[in-house]
């Protein structure tokens, strides 16, 4: 009993007729006003080979036209989009989702068994409320931390871009900016992502995109608790303007008693202090790389104690050998610190040995009598800037040191070794 479009068969009651497709937000596009064409029994499903209603639309400006590739029955069996065949809940390939939920694909692949299985699944779908998937996926009740970490919560509209213009690659395209295809260099043909098959993606086998995501999941960073057992505070970043203290409390109260929640709206972050260390560790483990509040993915880290921050502040301007260096005098406050000072705050700038003499303090001398004092910092040319230390309100964010301040630099003791 065949149900394909090309065969002259009596069993046309199994052909699918739908009023609206099952699509993900990415394939539907960012434009809320789209024009969609509907072709009844337009093509055969690429999985079950049954005729179904084909929908075609343009998801946005300078995007390629998209259409449904599989029927709605095959889409409901796997809970995937009819166009991209990605999971509707997580936005991931079927192979990644089944690996995270420990599901095993049991769909038949031969024609006769496939038709019999499809008819049974259609009967099960008709008896359900339509809000939950059927089959093995509908019976899976456990959630996976890996899926929550890899899930794509926001649409990725770059996936709807046009294909690469083959004439432009050969240097023969004469349309210029009017060409509806992309004028970009194609990817490496040896790249596994360049060869994808829609049936392999549906059945969850040999999917290069899924293999890439599974490798990324195996190398994901972990949030280890600090050695200081007194730290019970978590840092939550990326709040935005919509997430409030009550939203954070509604999520974190399940892990234990919360002592305080401090929201820093200017920095779009919050500090959540728990009453016990055990509650903080459970909250960090359950929320790291998988915390989503009001549709926003939040960054969770461990807070730092006041003692640790005080030690870091004391180390500013001190070399690894313990030599205290004075800040460079005469720099106006408008100058930002050099990038190297920000990135390598604890580096040894001067290559000092482990033991060295204390630094020499440079004392600025007052100007000779009869000479007007130099203008204040920020006025006049740089050569006339004051050499003394600027006022406290004009200092740079951190102390800055030059290699010439190092007493062990090359040439500092040249006079001692010179011949008389």
Curated annotation (Swiss-Prot):
Q: What is known of its domains?
A: The C-terminal RRM domain and the zinc finger motif are necessary for RNA-binding.
The record's function comment reads:
Required for pre-mRNA splicing as component of the activated spliceosome. Involved in the first step of pre-mRNA splicing. Binds directly to the internal stem-loop (ISL) domain of the U6 snRNA and to the pre-mRNA intron near the 5' splice site during the activation and catalytic phases of the spliceosome cycle.
Disordered, as annotated region: 303-343, 372-420
Q: Corresponding gene?
A: RBM22
The entry lists its GO molecular-function terms as:
pre-mRNA binding; U6 snRNA binding; zinc ion binding
Zinc finger (C3H1-type) residue ranges? 159-186
Entry-linked InterPro entries: Cwc2/Slt11, Nucleotide-bd_a/b_plait_sf, RBD_domain_sf, RRM_dom, STL11/RBM22-like_N, Znf_CCCH, Znf_CCCH_sf
Point to the regions of Basic and acidic residues compositional bias. Answer: 309-318
Where in the cell does this protein reside? Nucleus; Cytoplasm
Q: Does the keyword S-adenosyl-L-methionine apply?
A: no
Q: What is this protein called?
A: Pre-mRNA-splicing factor RBM22
Query: In its keyword annotation, does this UniProt entry include Phosphoprotein?
Result: no
Q: Which UniProt keywords apply?
A: Cytoplasm, Metal-binding, mRNA processing, mRNA splicing, Nucleus, RNA-binding, Spliceosome, Zinc, Zinc-finger
The protein's matches in SMART domains, at most eight in alphabetical order, are given as:
RRM, ZnF_C3H1
GO BP annotations of the record are: cellular response to xenobiotic stimulus; mRNA cis splicing, via spliceosome; positive regulation of RNA splicing
Per the UniProt entry, what species is this protein from, by scientific name? Gallus gallus
Principal location class: nucleus
Q: Family per UniProt?
A: Belongs to the SLT11 family.
Assembly and oligomerization: Component of the pre-catalytic and catalytic spliceosome complexes. Component of the postcatalytic spliceosome P complex.
